[in-house]
Every structure is written in structure tokens, then in C-alpha cells.
């Protein structure tokens, strides 16, 4: 019955193989139309994608509708019939996922979404990455530094068998490493006059990410147990503090990396190096990078993003208001999202109170990433270099007195930073140069 109905839907669409024959089609025209209609506010469904060989003129004019895709996608996974999309007759662009149905696959930490939805996600990732990051080293060459191998990723056709490889999804995804985070050399103590979380004003930035909604997102998106979600929702969990290693952090990182394929960064330096300002900056950048890698994978998932935002109204408002500042979030509803992925790094610095201007990247003869020249800047004397945060991550605005002649230039690393950057276990993959056009 399911296959008969699906075959009728695809009768005039024979240029692409049916989804049960190919788990990753090269191109699906109707799926792009459905995504655009669903996440761009078109309440009338998708644009017509076929209008020939139909007996009914109304059907030809109407085309493939959003409700058709809902029904069709759940035929491949009937057990998820009421998860994620709500009523098929609902006119709203999307509906939130009931929380009691989010945590139904706790043993394998797998989101409860249909196979068809995962196909769309993985197809979009594979299709867009080659144009965007030609200089990035492949994930294959650095698998020895990853605690989670691609072979442990869940398979599309065998969701219960987590040992099946999913190489077509994992081998094409590129992530930043610690060496690629723009360094911000600042003298003295970083003052947090307007902080977002638990930290006290004037405290050194030591790797905490106090914004609790970041962890709520990861819990909702990656099926962590409800008990873990409740703990994280109550307070900001320390991430990167060398003296605190909560099991929640390890569970979070392990679960998200297993599903998304994000490589886990290597271990921290030995205990004799875990002291001083330079180590704090290293630890902060390292863990900030880990979270940004995971979050970019979550935000890039068209099917998860709107539903999570409805479950977190505060973050929904903040992300909506940050759109003019962050081109990535403004284009997250579109298929080609990775062209602005570099804006994630400064954005998550702002979440963690790591005040810095939005960086500009350009190609250099040295083949290295750009860094800020902050040798003449101090926080206390040059407040105009710092974005003014007025109400949260979504309200960040650069001061109008930001100097027009401010240009990024290369800053040499200290001996301690060079020692960290030369350690092979500090990053999962390296980028020789970054030159996107913002």
C-alpha cells in the first residue's frame, strides 16, 4: 500500500530514483520546493513541480503539496507518523515536536525523524561542501585523532545498527580546528560588565559557556535523556574548566559527535601545563570550537531548527533579532547554508562573553588564517573595539565609533601557543587557509 501510493506520487518524476532505492539522491527538485515553502512562510504549500500527465486540471495546477510530502515521508518510517510535522492539514509552516516523543531512542541517541528527512539533510550537506571549502583538509586524513570514527555513525537504512558505516555523509563534512580560531591577544583582565550567565563581573574568561539555551538545543536535537536535559536547563554547565569535568559535558559531546560526525577534539594538555592565562585562553578556544562545530551541524539541519526554536521561546527571539548581524542565521532556512559558516566562530565568542569585533578574512601569501592585530588595544582604554551587548546574544550591535581603518593582520603566536598548536592531539583536522567572502 505504501509503495503503491508513493509510486503514484512519483509517476511523473522518473528522472530521480525513488527514495527507497537511493538513500542519497543527487538532486530532488520537489524536496527543495517543499523546504522553501515550509521554512519561508508559504502557507499554501510548495510551488507546482509537475503539471503533466494528470487527469485532473486541479491537480495539475496545485502540484505536489506539503501534506503529500508529510504523508509520503512517514510511509518510509510509519512508526514516526506524528512526530515533528504535526497534523497534515495544519496550515502553519511547521509544528513543534512533543517533548515526550523526543526521547524515544535513548539507547542509540538518535533523533526521531523520518528517513526521508535525514536524506534531505545529508544530501544538502554533501551537495554544498565542495564549492565552499576547497582548502580544507579531509576528515579521512585525520581520523586517527578522532575518538568517534565514521564507522560508528548510524546507517540510513539500518537505524538500529549503529555499527554500519555512513561514509557518504561523514567524509565530506569539514570542521574548524583549534588553530583556525582567530586569536585575540588582549592585555589584562577581561571585564564582563554585561554578562549572559553565571560569571561574576571582572572574572577571567576561563572556558565557561554560561548560556543554558545552547545546551537545551543540543539536548533537544540529539535525544539526550530527559534527566540530563533538566539539569542543563536549570543552570549554565561549565564547559572547558580544567578543574571541573562533569559527566554531562562528556555525555553531550559524545552523543552529538556520534550522530553528526563532528570529530571530538583531542585531550587537554598535561596537568603541569594547566595553569596561567595562556592555558585558559587555549582551553576556552578549544571548547568553544567544539561547541560551535556541533551547533553548526544542528542549525544546518532544516528539519530540526524551527521545532527547537519553538520549544525555546527565549532563544527563538534572540536568534530572530540577530539575523542582521549574522548572515549565517539569516540563510539557515536556505539550502546552501555553508557559505557563511565562518560567522559562527565570532558569534559563539559573543555567547561566551568573549568580546571581539566581527572578523574579516582574506587570503594571505603566507597561507595562514588572519588574526587580529590587538597589540595597541586594551579593553580598558578602547571600549569602542568591543560590541555592546544590551540584552543577550541576539542584541549585539557594534558601536558606531568602530574605527573605519581597522584591518586584520597577522599576529605571531607566543611560545606556549606554538607548543599547543604543534601538539597532534589538539585538533581533529587542520585548515591551511580560510578565504571565504563574507
Swiss-Prot record:
Chain's role: Together with the penton and the other minor capsid proteins (M1249L, p17), forms a complicated network immediately below the outer capsid shell, stabilizing the whole capsid. Plays an essential role in the formation of infectious virus particles. Especially required for the formation of the capsid vertices. During virion assembly, associates with the membrane and probably mediates the docking of the penton complex to the inner membrane, where it recruits the capsomers to form the penton core.
Instruction: Identify the GO cellular component terms for this protein.
Output: virion component
- Describe the family membership recorded for this protein in Swiss-Prot or TrEMBL: Belongs to the asfivirus p49 structural protein family.
Sorted alphabetically, the keyword list is: Late protein, Virion
Q: Where in the cell is it found?
A: Virion
Q: Does the keyword tRNA-binding apply?
A: no
- Per the UniProt record, the source organism is African swine fever virus (isolate Pig/Kenya/KEN-50/1950) (ASFV)
The parts of the chain that form a coiled coil are none
Induction pattern: Expressed in the late phase of the viral replicative cycle.
| Chief place of localization | virion
Stated name of the protein: Minor capsid protein p49
